[in-house]
Amino acid sequence: MPYDNVIAITYQGSSLPVVHHRCARGPNVFRHLETTYLTGAYVLDPIYQYHLRRERSGIFRLLDVAPDQFKRSHYYEWYYGLIGITDEISVVQTVGDDTTITVSMGKDRSSAQMFSWLDERRLRRHEAVIMTLLKAHWASGADPLSRQPRGLTITDGLIAAMRDRHSLTLSRRQAEVALLILQGHSSVSIGLNLSISPQTVKVYRKQLYHKCNLSSQAELFALTMPILQQISMLPTGKQRSSVTRAG
């Protein structure tokens, strides 16, 4: 299957992702990987959230696992607009209790194309072989990751940082709603994740925006992104994620 770029990442629990391989045939779409994605933006990534939910292995288009309003989210506009990836197909293989191996193939501005249904079908023909190879590679111990206990959740970290950095006291629900908004969930989707009504979600969002003196998702993103970067830099075992039940 022709692609413009490819990256292999392993996620383990809520530890920082480990990048094993990257290659871009055209523009360097990975130029912001260390400075942006790995310093906190990954927390909002659909593939990372899919990993945390421990859902089935398979081959997925990005929007197959993304929230319902992902392409309208400020994260999508900010990060995907920044790197220039226009389409993505990921091979996702779960191994063990908390580890996910991913290989993501992308299209970017160099080809100005999207993956066709025929591209996807050809890749799926080899799905069983690809998954077997990924599991065998992991079992061989080629890319071991340290296993450490999990501690503070991303939600708790957001609450604590808002208090310490901005003297703002968020309830757990307000913090959960904030994170889900940033991931690209609609009010209906947030309600399904938190088992509350869309109307209640709107109440929490209104409270959140009022408390933080915000008027847009872009302002919420600007306020919370430095905090997510701070949380992501905590030693492993000091942070783990929550709000990860549905896509």
Where do the model's predicted regions map?
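Regulatory input/activation interfaces that engage signals or partners
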Residues: 2-109, 122, 128, 132-138
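Juxtadomain coupling helices with adjacent low-complexity linkers
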Residues: 111-155
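Regulatory hinge/linker segments at domain boundaries
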Residues: 143-173, 233-236, 241
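Non-catalytic regulatory/interaction regions at protein termini and inter-domain linkers
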Residues: 170, 189, 203, 218, ...
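Pre-recognition alpha-helix immediately N-terminal to the DNA-recognition helix
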Residues: 175-177, 219
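Short helix-to-turn junction characteristic of helix-turn-helix DNA-binding domains
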Residues: 181-185, 224
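Recognition helix of helix-turn-helix DNA-binding domains
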Residues: 184-219
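Residue cluster at the C-terminal edge of the helix-turn-helix DNA-binding motif
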Residues: 210-215, 223, 227-231
